[in-house]
Regions:
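Helix-turn-helix
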Residues: 5, 9, 13, 17-51, ...
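Amphipathic, non-transmembrane alpha-helical scaffold segments
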Residues: 11, 57, 61, 82, ...
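Solvent-exposed, amphipathic alpha-helical segments
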Residues: 13-20, 67-74, 154, 158-166
Length: 192
């Protein structure tokens, strides 16, 4: 149990440091110091810094991707899928806001960077989940055929921007009514 607690502490401290300084600006020694561990103790749990990053993805992002896929698959309609995806995405983002904001800023890291290599698969998975919503709704929206990826990117961008805006006010206020307003605005745009 102590090993698992230490491992989780390393992941949480790393999230905070990566959020505050960026992935490239943080070294393993700084993570070890903040965790009150020696470097060998940290290396017992993770081979290197990219191993920590992969641990973050496995511990926190993989389960979110599974939840997002489930809520979309269990939705009864196009609009229900959008709402359920957005509620899940926002609630997970607010629950672990620094992780979400770290990922949001770092997704624009250079294509060959360590971070990009670790995160691109997850980013693609999330985009594909949203894209599937639009692919399944082709019959509803005649203007959508061939533009599913554009719609998915715009939808994710709207949610992400609003999450960032609410955070910049130092208090995440993304609740059901805020998400409903975003969905309403998005639907108004695509139905016109």
């Amino acid at each position: 149990m102590a090993n698992e607690q230490t491992r989780l502490k390393i992941l949480q401290v790393s999230i905070e440091l990566f959020y505050e300084k960026g992935y490239d600006a943080v070294g393993v020694q700084e993570i070890a110091d903040k965790c009150e561990l020696t470097k060998p103790a940290l290396y017992y749990h993770f081979k290197n810094k990219s191993g920590i990053l992969e641990g973050i993805m496995q511990q926190y992002i993989d389960p979110v991707v599974v939840k997002l896929r489930e809520v979309v698959n269990n939705s009864s309609s196009f609009e229900d899928s959008l709402h359920n995806f957005a509620y899940c995405y926002v609630s997970e983002g607010c629950e672990n806001l620094h992780l979400y904001l770290m990922l949001m800023t770092m997704q624009y890291s250079p294509p060959m960077s360590e971070f990009n290599n670790a995160f691109i698969h997850h980013c693609t998975e999330i985009n594909n989940i949203v894209k599937s919503i639009f692919i399944n709704a082709r019959g509803l929206l005649g203007n959508m055929n061939g533009r599913e990826n554009q719609f998915a990117t715009t939808f994710l961008g709207m949610i992400g921007f609003h999450m960032y805006e609410y955070h910049s006010e130092k208090e995440p206020k993304m609740n059901k009514s805020a998400v409903d307003m975003i969905i309403h605005q998005f639907l108004h745009g695509i139905y016109s």
